[in-house]
């Protein structure tokens, strides 16, 4: 139930926005029961994932160390300060989020994020949870067939789920993955090497300050399901950095859940807002109401150069259902996203 009939009967008017829709839905016991189950499922997923990672955390760290020791493709910065908008949130109900270290050389939260994420997505992102990256590659090769990048940057790339397919698709390019979290970066390089992907490097840095890179350093700058983790000021700063760093003729692409527009029903908006209230995604709601075209323009991109599109995850159809391609609406759960970006 979307609560509209009851709301109209009680107030004598239609709902004005998604916030009124959400509050009306809170009076529906079916919605509350579904919401409680969904939250409990996420907590149980984290408990199970962390249980399997924590009990072998020292062994995992040893393996990662052997794979990455003295490898200059892992560039960590012990002096980095994790901003409050990151440190104050256990994203996706994961204790310690992506950045917390339990001992020197730790990779626990990277391991948890990697293997338990498969469960969260029910396999719809493929056996390596990399369907989003393959989707981006397909989109670029289809829409920009002559594009031959040499330097690629992914901001907020964690363990490289979406980055490695790009690196594999463009083997002559150098792929740089930037993230704040040392555990996910250590794990990410070890994971990449174990998968035989060598044209990557993992750098600990904030996407808001990439001053270690010179202007116009990259042909392609990518974020994948990352913008909703950002405060509004951080998003603006990162957009500014992408404009500074992209080369003439290069592209910037952001892959995200769709923005809230007048074409989207208030019920759908309220359902999509669930993550903001119950899945530790405090910036989700605000970010999805932003006019990203305007945000891009304010960062210095010409409106005429903006790119829009859509992608669905590419998975092994022999092993997993291609659920992202069906026409049903599940309010943000299926592996289908919008693309916004620019060609400079």
What is each model feature region?
Residues 1-89:
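N-terminal accessory segments
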Residues 208-221:
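A short acidic, Gly/Pro-enriched loop at the edge of an enzyme's catalytic core
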Residues 253-318:
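C-terminal alpha-helical "lid/dimerization" subdomain adjacent to the S-adenosyl-L-methionine
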Residues 148-158:
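Conserved class I S-adenosyl-L-methionine
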Residues 112, 126-148:
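Conserved alpha-helix/loop element of class I SAM-dependent methyltransferases that forms part
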Residues 153, 163-209:
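Class I SAM-dependent methyltransferase SAM/SAH-binding core
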Residues 299-344:
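Core SAM-dependent methyltransferase catalytic element
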Residues 236-248:
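A short glycine-rich, Lys/Arg-flanked "PGG" loop and its adjoining helix->strand segment in the class I
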């Amino acid at each position: 139930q979307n609560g509209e009939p009851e709301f109209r009967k009680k107030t004598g008017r239609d709902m004005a926005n998604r916030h009124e829709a959400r509050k009306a839905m809170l009076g529906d016991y079916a919605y509350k029961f579904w919401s409680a189950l969904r939250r409990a499922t996420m907590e149980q997923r984290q408990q199970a994932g962390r249980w399997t990672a924590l009990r072998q955390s020292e062994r995992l760290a040893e393996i990662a160390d052997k794979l990455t020791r003295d490898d200059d493709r892992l560039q960590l910065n012990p002096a980095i300060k994790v901003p409050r908008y990151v440190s104050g949130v256990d994203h996706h109900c994961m204790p310690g989020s992506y950045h917390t270290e339990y001992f020197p050389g730790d990779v626990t939260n990277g391991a948890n994020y990697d293997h338990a994420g498969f469960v969260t997505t029910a396999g719809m992102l493929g056996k390596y949870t990399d369907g989003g990256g393959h989707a981006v590659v397909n989109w670029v090769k289809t829409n920009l067939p002559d594009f031959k990048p040499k330097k690629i940057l992914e901001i907020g790339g964690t363990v490289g789920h979406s980055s490695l397919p790009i690196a594999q698709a463009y083997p002559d390019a150098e792929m740089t993955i930037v993230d704040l979290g040392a555990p996910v970066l250590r794990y990410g390089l070890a994971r990449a090497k174990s998968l035989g992907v060598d044209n990557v490097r993992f750098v600990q840095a904030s996407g808001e300050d990439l001053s270690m890179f010179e202007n116009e350093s990259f042909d392609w700058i990518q974020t994948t399901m990352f913008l909703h983790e950002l405060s509004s000021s951080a998003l603006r700063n990162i957009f500014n950095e992408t404009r500074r760093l992209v080369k003439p003729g290069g592209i910037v692409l952001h892959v995200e859940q769709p923005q809230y527009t007048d074409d989207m029903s208030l019920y759908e908006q309220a359902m999509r807002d669930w993550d903001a209230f119950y899945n530790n995604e405090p910036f989700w709601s605000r970010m999805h109401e932003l006019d990203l075209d305007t945000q891009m323009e304010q960062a210095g991109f010409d409106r005429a150069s903006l790119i829009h599109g859509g992608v669905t995850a590419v998975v092994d159809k022999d092993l997993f259902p291609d659920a992202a391609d069906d026409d049903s609406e599940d309010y943000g759960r299926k592996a289908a996203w919008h693309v916004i970006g620019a060609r400079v």
